[in-house]
């Protein structure tokens, strides 16, 4: 992508059609789990923020699509992610085998709970 995307729609418009279909499904699952989350572009990726904090991101690479829920969810849901290529904070998957919506929702809800706990802790310190 030569120009920086201004929105997730703009980001998706520049992704190849096969990967776009997988990422649209991923976006829908994220939105269903976090309807109050704000869409944005962060570090060149399609991302979501909730209550001012990073929630999750996703993107397309040359040979795969990727979902970025952060390190903790990848570790906690390791057994459910065994069929995917993972590394700290990243889940890679082929465009023709998108992540199941139920698993995405579970990961997003875990991140929402993490952010909520962090926000409560931050509030107590003030």
What does each model-found stretch correspond to?
Residues 1-126:
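Charge-dense, helix-prone N-terminal extensions
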């Amino acid at each position: 992508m030569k120009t920086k995307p201004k929105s997730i729609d703009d980001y998706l418009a520049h992704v190849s059609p096969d990967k776009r279909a997988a990422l649209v499904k991923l976006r829908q699952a994220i939105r269903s789990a976090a309807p109050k989350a704000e869409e944005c572009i962060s570090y060149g990726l399609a991302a979501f923020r909730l209550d001012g904090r990073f929630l999750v991101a996703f993107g397309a690479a040359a040979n795969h699509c990727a979902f970025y829920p952060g390190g903790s969810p990848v570790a906690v849901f390791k057994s459910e992610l065994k069929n995917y290529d993972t590394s700290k904070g990243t889940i890679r998957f082929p465009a023709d085998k998108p992540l199941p919506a139920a698993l995405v929702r579970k990961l997003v809800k875990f991140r929402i709970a993490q952010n909520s706990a962090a926000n409560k802790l931050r509030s107590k310190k003030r």
